[in-house]
């Protein structure tokens, strides 16, 4: 898929306005589907969203970024908080938030339990049980589950 041609097509079909700036993939985007840069008008998109969630979700993200784009160049409110943005986003059926991506490098949760009061602690990082104690009763902590690394 040629990204620039696709964004131009979505802009004409859904907004009735041409897109005349630059579009590019940005692999460094983590928690967002795309970004609009008002300074020069270009758009960045997260390729993982397209690969993992498919074309339907990606089209809605393109619509979201094009809402920012077209409203900015019309001199209207283009930020998420602005009424113009919210109304246009709803009219073109764009996504407000990106659905979460399957994260392959997320850390497994470690579960610790106090031996005295049975208080549970969930942590992504290891706790030194020789050094740290329960925050409620000062009892010893015990690692309950050891996730596979």
UniProtKB/Swiss-Prot annotation:
Q: Which sites bind Zn(2+)?
A: 64, 68
The record's subcellular location field reads: Cytoplasm
SMART domains attached to this UniProt entry: SprT (SM00731)
* Keyword field: Cytoplasm, Metal-binding, Zinc
Tell me, what is an example of a GO biological process annotation in this record? response to stress
Q: What is its main location?
A: cytoplasm
Active-site residues, record numbering mapped to chain: 65
| Co-factor requirement | Zn(2+)
* Residue intervals of the SprT-like domain: 4-144
- Please provide an example of a Pfam family that matches this protein in its UniProt record: SprT-like
Q: List the GO cellular component terms.
A: cytoplasm
Highest taxon in the source lineage: Bacteria
GO MF term set: zinc ion binding
Cofactor binding, note field: Binds 1 zinc ion.
List, alphabetically, the InterPro entries matched.
SprT-like_domain, SprT_Zn_ribbon, Uncharacterised_SprT-like
Q: Which family does it belong to?
A: Belongs to the SprT family.
HAMAP family, A to Z = SprT_like
Protein name listed in UniProt: Protein SprT-like
Q: Which organism is it from?
A: Streptococcus pneumoniae serotype 4 (strain ATCC BAA-334 / TIGR4)
């Amino acid at each position: 898929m040629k990204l620039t041609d696709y964004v131009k097509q979505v802009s004409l079909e859904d907004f009735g306005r041409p897109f005349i700036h630059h579009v590019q993939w940005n692999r460094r985007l983590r928690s967002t589907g795309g970004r609009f840069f008002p300074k020069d008008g270009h758009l960045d998109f997260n390729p993982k969203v397209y690969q993992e969630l498919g074309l339907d979700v990606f089209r809605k993200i393109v619509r979201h970024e094009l809402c920012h784009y077209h409203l900015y160049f019309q001199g209207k409110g283009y930020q998420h908080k602005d009424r113009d943005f919210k109304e246009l986003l709803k009219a073109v059926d764009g996504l407000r938030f990106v659905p979460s991506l399957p994260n392959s490098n997320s850390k497994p949760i470690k579960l610790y339990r106090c031996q005295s009061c049975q208080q549970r602690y969930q942590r992504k990082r290891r706790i030194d049980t020789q050094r740290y104690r329960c925050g409620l009763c000062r009892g010893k902590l015990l690692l309950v589950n050891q996730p596979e690394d």
